[in-house]
């Protein structure tokens, strides 16, 4: 059984036991979160596609950790003007372990 969920503006295909990194969710490590934005559920060949979400479907997950992504370097330059700007960014992420899919 798997589902397609939407969180943080992105879509993820998940199954029981999967570990995924999503955009930061406000929850402590060890907490349980419920993701209600389920776009599709498939179970033993029976597929349900939502319009836009599947009614009554939910995915439960356990928060494993709050982490940060890799550092992205932003470098701006204008030639011949001695204009250089260097900036860095690390995105806050939440690591989730999928514990259940209810269709």
From Swiss-Prot:
The keyword Ribonucleoprotein is assigned to this record: yes
Record note on quaternary structure: Part of the 50S ribosomal subunit. Contacts protein L20.
Highest classification ranks of the organism: Bacteria, Pseudomonadati, Pseudomonadota, Alphaproteobacteria, Rhodospirillales
GO molecular function: rRNA binding; structural constituent of ribosome
Function as written in the Swiss-Prot or TrEMBL entry: This protein binds to 23S rRNA in the presence of protein L20.
Protein name: Large ribosomal subunit protein bL21
Superkingdom of the source species: Bacteria
GO cellular component: cytoplasm; ribonucleoprotein complex; ribosome
A GO BP entry: translation
Organism: Rhodospirillum centenum (strain ATCC 51521 / SW)
């Amino acid at each position: 059984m798997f589902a397609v969920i939407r969180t943080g503006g992105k879509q993820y295909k998940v199954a029981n036991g999967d570990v995924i990194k999503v955009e930061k969710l406000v929850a402590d490590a060890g907490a349980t979160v419920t993701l209600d934005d389920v776009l599709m559920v498939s179970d033993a060949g029976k597929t349900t596609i939502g319009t836009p979400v599947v009614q009554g479907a939910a995915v439960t997950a356990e928060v494993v950790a709050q982490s940060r992504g890799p550092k992205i370097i932003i470098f701006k330059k204008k030639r011949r003007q001695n204009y250089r700007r260097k900036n860095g960014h690390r995105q806050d992420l939440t690591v989730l372990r999928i514990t259940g899919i209810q269709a």
